């Protein structure tokens, strides 16, 4: 059996990934497909944490554009990520995968508060840890949350799962036929070229902490496992 390239990973899932083709709401059959792949990876002995977005329910930026106070709109987005985290937890545990949800905003009746050392112990014990609530602060994206949590738990890599996009391109391949795919980049390349991989705060944090990123197509079955095994899929963004 091929030895995995990465042992402790942070998987970044967008909220839209849980919504399927509709792009809105939570679709249990779609979640089950994703979770089945996570289970296969878990059975390899991989320590996995998940950061999930909330864009399938609410986006703080859009709320702000419609006249809401930005901080208030962002807090609503953080609560949306908790709903997604609970949906993931329910499906994972139904498939026999031990799971803990940790939130950056305390809501003890439904999840643990985020405590770094406790999160690390859960990972060591083979539990999948789902980080919800973003960073707990407005104005920060869940991409930044992924970079922050990856640094805090000393993850080997961030797996950036994209919907129907198989890597990083010079432009959006869905609208620009001349867009070219990058096989490998650095976080500095991403920032200097203005590539839409993750926001600049997340890229800077990943660069400063030398955390690599693998950007791949979530919609192709088996890609989470392939990324962890180190197969040549998507785009690898090196830490330095």
UniProtKB/Swiss-Prot annotation:
UMP binds at residues 54, 74, 135-142. ATP binds at residues 12-15, 55, 59, 163, 169, 172. Pathway: Pyrimidine metabolism; CTP biosynthesis via de novo pathway; UDP from UMP (UMPK route): step 1/1. It comes from the Bacteria. Residues 20-25 are annotated as: Involved in allosteric activation by GTP. It catalyses: UMP + ATP = UDP + ADP. GO terms for cellular component: cytoplasm. Belongs to the UMP kinase family. Homohexamer. This is Uridylate kinase. It comes from Enterococcus faecalis (strain ATCC 700802 / V583). The gene is pyrH.
